[in-house]
């Protein structure tokens, strides 16, 4: 059975439900392209089922463009994008029509199968002569950071709940079955702004043979792909406990990540110092509970951390703040991406120290702190440390600076014996030969001793021994034993 989503996909922008501003922007963009004005590619960003791909196909149909699409089910690595997209971006189709290139779900590019895909897309976009439309569910993924600078971003919001029932009625009429108005409204409310999900639910009920209100109420809520930006808006704007705690329930992010988002955007929303202080106070208490979860491995504390960071932050303000606030991803994520190389170099240094000291890299960091002090104060000792831990000049420059690294390695170079190159011996001239006169060995003079006293002492001892032999009755003295 054909899916109704494809069967009743709008063929024209006029048939697309809602998105009036987005449609106007797309019309202006495509007409400028047709008139010869160079335009940046369009990136349509929005939740699943909001109609991003439908908008791309509808505008292609309205302006008679052929479509070449690569979606998440296709392999989209560097070679595929270069061959398929790269060729299509600079040529016409076989029918002579202009070509619209659609790259669907570019935020899904990941893993070995899509290696190098984003970089190749950016390269293709710079030379593209045909219009390109990209779609993404989460445009703020780190992998798309460089891509965002090469496109015009258009946010496509969820389809309004009131725009879904007319579409469902139209499909039911064409399929030839009657449906109660309450059933239509129930399906629409469960869809959570996802028109595609609403159509699939309608088809599911119709093929099941029962289209009653009770059956519609048993449908699962489809708001499972709620954006982190929606969660931020709810938490920052509401003053109700239940609404705040449910804001992150369907967001597929860890609590630690949500905490970073709230911490980043609190100062953007809370303009009163008291509100801001109260908000960070609740957030700090949430962080304490998160720490206890990991330290004790008791995950029952999750709910306390979640309530403190959502409801606690929401109720920290005295009243709602009106007006639009532009929320942003945590700056720490961007910083971590930028400092990835530096952190890897530090890991390599710590591994060398840990290997020599037979400790962990965590303990090696304490050793490194003292080593840096030595590097900056004592070049001789530093040279020995560098040789022992087998550190490179680049690593010392990373820890200190180029001057200190140069001085330390100069000391190391001075300790090594110089290997002189052998030069061919020249024949010496007669006048260059210097006669070598061997030095006479020094004759050491005997120590001056009182010779007379030595002789007299020897004679006296001899006479004494002879006398003792002649008189055996007399007891010998102890001197005879020596």
UniProtKB/Swiss-Prot annotation:
Q: Provide the disulphide bond pattern.
A: none
Segments crossing the lipid bilayer: none
Composition-biased stretches (Basic and acidic residues)? 442-476
The record's listing under Pfam families reads:
AAA (PF00004), RCF1-5-like_lid (PF21960)
Task: Note whether ATP-binding occurs among the keywords.
Answer: yes
Q: Where is this region: Disordered?
A: 420-482
Alphabetical list of CDD domains matching this protein: AAA, HLD_clamp_RFC
Question: What's a Gene Ontology MF term here?
Answer: DNA clamp loader activity
**Top-level taxonomic group:** Archaea
Q: Which keywords belong to this entry?
A: ATP-binding, DNA replication, Nucleotide-binding
- Mind telling me which Gene3D superfamilies this protein's record contains? 1.10.8.60, P-loop containing nucleotide triphosphate hydrolases
UniProt: ATP binding residues: 46-53
**Tell me, which GO biological process terms does this entry list?**
DNA replication
Q: What is the annotated quaternary arrangement, including any partners?
A: Heteromultimer composed of small subunits (RfcS) and large subunits (RfcL).
Q: What does this protein do?
A: Part of the RFC clamp loader complex which loads the PCNA sliding clamp onto DNA.
Protein family membership: Belongs to the activator 1 small subunits family. RfcL subfamily.
Q: What is the protein name stated in its UniProt record?
A: Replication factor C large subunit
Instruction: Give the originating organism.
Output: Methanococcus maripaludis (strain C7 / ATCC BAA-1331)
């Amino acid at each position: 059975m054909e899916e109704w989503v494809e069967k009743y996909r709008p063929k024209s922008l006029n048939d697309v439900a809602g998105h009036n501003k987005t449609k106007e922007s797309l019309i202006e963009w495509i007409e400028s392209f047709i008139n010869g004005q160079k335009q940046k590619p369009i990136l349509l960003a929005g939740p699943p089922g909001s109609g991003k791909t439908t908008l791309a196909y509808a505008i292609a149909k309205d302006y008679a463009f052929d479509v070449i699409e690569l979606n998440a089910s296709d392999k989209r690595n560097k070679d595929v994008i270069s061959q398929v997209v790269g060729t299509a971006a600079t040529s016409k189709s076989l029918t002579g029509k202009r070509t619209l290139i659609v790259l669907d779900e570019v935020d899904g590019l990941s893993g070995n199968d899509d290696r190098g895909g984003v970089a190749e897309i950016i390269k293709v976009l710079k030379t593209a002569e045909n219009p390109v439309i990209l779609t993404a569910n989460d445009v703020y993924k780190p992998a798309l950071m460089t891509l965002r600078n090469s496109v015009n971003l258009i946010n496509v919001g969820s389809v309004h709940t009131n725009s879904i029932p007319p579409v469902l009625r139209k499909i039911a009429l064409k399929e030839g079955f009657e449906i109660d108005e309450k059933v239509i409204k129930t399906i629409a409310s469960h869809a959570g702004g996802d028109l595609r999900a609403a159509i699939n639910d309608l088809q599911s009920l119709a093929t099941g043979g029962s289209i009653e209100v009770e059956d519609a109420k048993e449908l699962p809520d489809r708001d499972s792909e709620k954006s982190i930006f929606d969660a931020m808006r709810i938490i920052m704007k509401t003053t109700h406990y239940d609404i705040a705690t449910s804001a992150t329930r369907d967001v597929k992010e860890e609590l630690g990540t949500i905490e970073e988002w709230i911490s980043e955007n609190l100062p953007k929303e809370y303009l009163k110092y008291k509100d801001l202080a109260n908000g960070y106070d609740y957030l700090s208490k949430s962080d304490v509970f998160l720490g206890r979860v990991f330290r004790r491995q008791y995950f029952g504390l999750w709910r306390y951390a979640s309530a403190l960071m959502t409801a606690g932050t929401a109720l920290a303000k005295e009243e709602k703040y009106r007006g639009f606030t532009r929320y942003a991803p945590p700056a720490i994520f961007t910083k971590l991406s930028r400092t990835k190389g530096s952190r890897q170099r530090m890991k390599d240094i710590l591994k060398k120290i840990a290997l020599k000291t037979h400790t962990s890299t965590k303990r090696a960091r304490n050793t490194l702190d003292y080593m840096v002090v030595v590097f900056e104060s004592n070049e001789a000792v530093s040279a020995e440390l560098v040789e022992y831990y087998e550190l490179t000049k680049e690593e010392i420059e990373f820890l200190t600076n180029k001057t200190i690294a140069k001085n330390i390695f100069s000391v190391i170079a001075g300790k090594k014996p110089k290997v002189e190159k052998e030069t061919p011996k020249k024949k010496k001239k007669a006048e260059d030969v210097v006669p070598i006169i061997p030095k006479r060995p020094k004759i050491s003079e005997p120590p001056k001793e009182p010779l007379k006293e030595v002789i007299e002492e020897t004679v006296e001892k001899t006479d004494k021994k002879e006398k003792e032999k002649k008189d055996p009755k007399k007891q010998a003295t102890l001197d005879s034993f020596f």
